[in-house]
Curated annotation (Swiss-Prot):
GO terms for biological process, alphabetical: DNA repair
Keywords assigned by UniProt, alphabetized: Hydrolase, Magnesium
Highest taxon in the source lineage: Bacteria
Residue numbers annotated as active site: 11
Phylogenetic lineage: Bacteria, Bacillati, Bacillota, Bacilli, Bacillales
Protein's UniProt name: Pyrophosphatase PpaX
Listed EC numbers: 3.6.1.1
Entries under Pfam families matching the protein: HAD_2
Organism: Listeria monocytogenes serovar 1/2a (strain ATCC BAA-679 / EGD-e)
GO molecular function, one term: magnesium ion binding
Keyword Hydrolase: yes
Length: 217
């Protein structure tokens, strides 16, 4: 493969695997535990999807942010395998990219072990050469550190890479790292939300990536 795009970096949650209901349920339980006098609707929780847990909890309840994060992670791991879902066509598209020798990596705001658990449950783990979790970087997305680390480990340059994600943190991180960017229309916040951050591409389905990388050759 000698095309312009050789390297594809993906967010995990809401992009490769559908963890939306797991995340929302975990936030609901955590918030009820620590802030029982406040009511958080589903719509209230949607903005929490994407940022790191500490960023969210420090904004909501700074005095108990560490405790909330620990409670969240414990509940999330306990219910992880039962509540995550696969997106149609993702496995097939990632397998096709892998079989065509594209370099594939993940850059997520989740911890490495939790990323790997989700990948193994969905069978995607065998396709990714590099996985960067929050515990491997000093600065979470939209800082470009994770993307730059992944590119270095993959021996790839920003000019030949694209960052794919479902949240503005992913698009902004890609722009900050000076890669191409793609949003996913199946993002829980909707394609209109992502479009305002001007990704280079908007994927209606994951297989759209195959056409994009082939067109760049």
């Amino acid at each position: 493969m000698t095309g312009k795009i050789t390297t594809l970096l993906f967010d995990l949650d809401g992009t490769l695997i559908n963890t939306n209901e797991l995340i929302i349920k975990t936030f609901q339980v955590t918030l009820q535990e620590f802030l029982p006098d406040r009511v958080f609707t589903r719509e209230d929780i949607l903005p929490f999807i994407g940022p790191s847990l500490m960023e969210t909890f420090r904004e909501i309840n700074p005095a108990h942010a560490d405790e909330m994060r620990a409670f969240y992670r414990e509940y999330n791991l306990k219910h992880h395998d039962d509540l995550i879902l696969e997106y149609d066509g993702v496995y097939e598209a990632i397998r096709a990219l892998y079989e065509e020798d594209y370099k594939l990596g993940i850059v997520s705001t989740k911890m490495y072990d939790t990323i790997m658990r989700g990948l193994k449950v969905t069978g995607l783990d065998k396709f990714f050469q590099v996985v960067i979790g929050l515990d491997q970087v000093s600065n979470a997305k939209p800082d470009p550190e994770g993307i730059e680390m992944a590119l270095s480990l993959l021996n790839a340059t920003k000019e030949e890479a694209i960052m794919i994600g479902d949240n503005y943190h992913d698009i902004e991180a890609g722009k900050n790292a000076e890669t191409l960017t793609a949003g996913v229309a199946w993002a829980i916040k909707g394609p209109e939300h992502l479009a305002q951050f001007q990704p280079d591409f908007m994927l209606e389905k994951m297989s759209d990536l195959l056409a994009i990388v082939r067109d760049e050759e």
